[in-house]
């Protein structure tokens, strides 16, 4: 909206100000009427002062708009001068002569007086012509009377007629105005009598010369008589003089125009006053409504144009995309030379003509040339039995599932196989020129070899050296001359005779990729009958890649693996021939033929060898009992399993935590002899020491397992395992130790199982009655009857021993194996290893190797030279593992030590030798205490009491950790 302009109008030293807005709301006719009414003038000439203080006349709407533009530049102020014009009264004869000349010249009837009024109203309130003068041409010419003056009777008649027409017109205008006012102000409907009161000379001009406007006051709702105040910005707002003096509900910033009476014509003040009474506000209201309608129309038109513009932009963008796409297609076709006049794919012009105006991007799928095929059916199913030397033709029904017609360059290419061809030189077979979606037959002629056996030949479609589609093959069984076809073989051969038309699984069976061909350069084919290798050069298709082959035709992992095995053992690979089953039931990997003579059924030994890394090995107890016998420690041989570092740590931690839990994963085998020289005291304490010594022996044996990777010993172990296995039973049972019971907290089971078990282990020299591999539960049952070991040293008594020296003892809980489990699963292979030896992966590996049990109190000669060498060889590995573990692992070590050395105190302190000192240092190194000087100083300080040394080291580490963190 334009800014408001103040008009300062001056007339004979009288100045009045008018506040106007844009020229659309307040027109030049409104300004002229307001000026005339304000200064009570009839004929005026308005001039304004421009920038050079020169007077410029205003006589039209355009000049008025220019004046407003000038006022905006002058601070929204416009100085205007009003000059009163002299009204010249037209004399009757000249207009009569002029009117006669007009009538004579035009030959038309002049307008009547009321029509003239209507025309004057439509031309912005211009001064109308004299109606009395125009009425004279209606008088018929009387030849007897002079033409200068009409007769009196005619003049009086016309005056009466004129008054009647004017009254009727004014009444109609008042009625229309009243209807509009009622619509705008419903309160006026209650007083229609006041508004529609019949007008007459007495009501129009009241005494005291007050004019009745026939308009209701917007404030008091009464008819305005006399002075009327109209808002200069809101033409429909009118109030009377009394309301203007008091408060009224309107914007105080709007200037009110004071109107005494409407503008009247100079010749007929009475008629024009009656006419102008209702027309002025009605005209303003109509203009306002029309402008509002125009504004709404313009707004809707702008929105429509804006939407059309957006749509055109989107269309142009889409056309640009399609044009860019067609350019790429044209460039792609021109590069790869598919400009064949017969093929519509080589004509990008036709594509542009047909698809340029298509908004959706549809030509992507139809333009890309794609080679693809699907296997439908065949004539000779896999496993067909033939006589030697039989000449036969293998047919494959193939469907062209791509969008390119097969040409002379499309051939069926030989890949590998040992089935004799009828023509050895013919490695590529022509295929029919199939159109997209058509089905055809591809045939190859073979000759059955002379020797009996299974023969195969693998083929694949190729276009200009680029392979595509599924791999097809022919697999037959050549019988000996005395045909011995059993019903089983016939049934096996006919299992996969039904075929269906599908593509997915058969394409997953594809064996060879063009990429593989480019990398290898040639494919080795080997026939079983001639035993000759015929290298075939594959075509280099890198420079001639013209057609797109979908990814579903690429080779699977099974095919790549089979291709790598092809050069290693072609005979064995040729026996693993998949059946030509229909594509919807083809297995994901090639099945083995039921009658293959070269592939043995994988036995327990192979399965055991494959599962050896995962650690899931066990044996049924029937085989274990065969090998279980009392063997002397001094006469056993070495046969150890190779373990990785991670498995060794897992096993060591589990063994240190669970001495009574589960069997070893190795079968009972010959054991390593250990030479140890020490004196064992008699009694329960001696048995406990003896068990600890056996634990040290076990760790030495474990070191031997890790260091000696002898293939002969591994084979011997495997043979031993296989000899104990059963052909009918290949189930594996894994008994997890007590520490894996997730329903119990770690404090209940983890450390309690780390205690010694003197009732379960014996030295082989003095007590050969109890086998080394016996289960803890069984040993507990046998001890009271068959052994002299006291009952109070059973596992229950050991479990009830406090593991932390001050806490409440544990409640003994000995769980026997269920009857369904083996009575004695694969037993341990060391005397001192009753714990679990399963390499089960543990989420948090404890840093407590079971070498910590090598130095109990009261033992005189505990560690031999082999233990020393083992500790030295392992301490670097143990320190590297313990260096990455957290404080919780150290607390586990301390708790295990407390549980280990919770036995009865010994008064006599043994003399510590240099080897024993080195062993203690190695223990500390494996637990992560790598400060040699500090360890040696603490050992001397605590008189080689490793429990006190570990406790003080833990306190030092905790203090250092807190000081560094906080």
From Swiss-Prot:
GO terms for molecular function: mitogen-activated protein kinase binding; ubiquitin binding; zinc ion binding. The gene is NBR1. InterPro entries: Ig-like_fold, N_BRCA1_central, PB1-like, PB1_dom, PB1_NBR1, UBA, UBA-like_sf, UBA_NBR1_C. Changing residue 732 to A: Loss of interaction ATG8 family proteins. The modification Phosphothreonine is found at residue 586. It is found in: Cytoplasm; Cytoplasmic vesicle, Autophagosome; Lysosome; Cytoplasm, Myofibril, Sarcomere, M line. Changing residue 928 to A: About 2-fold weaker interaction with ubiquitin than WT. It holds the Pfam family N_BRCA1_IG. SUPFAM superfamilies: CAD & PB1 domains, RING/U-box, UBA-like. Homooligomer and heterooligomer. Interacts with TRIM55. Interacts with titin/TTN. Interacts with RNF29, USP8, MAP1LC3A, MAP1LC3B, MAP1LC3C, GABARAP, GABARAPL1 and GABARAPL2. Binds to ubiquitin and ubiquitinated proteins. Interacts with SQSTM1. Interacts with TAX1BP1. Interacts with IRF3; this interaction mediates autophagic degradation of IRF3. Interacts with IL12A and IL12B. The PB1 domain mediates interaction with SQSTM1. It comes from the Eukaryota. GO terms for cellular component: autophagosome; cytosol; intracellular membrane-bounded organelle; late endosome; lysosome; M band; membrane; mitochondrial intermembrane space. Keywords: Cytoplasm, Cytoplasmic vesicle, Host-virus interaction, Lysosome, Metal-binding, Phosphoprotein, Ubl conjugation, Zinc, Zinc-finger. Changing residue 586 to A: Loss of phosphorylation by GSK3A. (Microbial infection) Cleaved by S.pyogenes SpeB protease; leading to its degradation. Degradation by SpeB prevents autophagy, promoting to S.pyogenes intracellular replication. This is Next to BRCA1 gene 1 protein. A zinc finger (ZZ-type) spans 212-264.
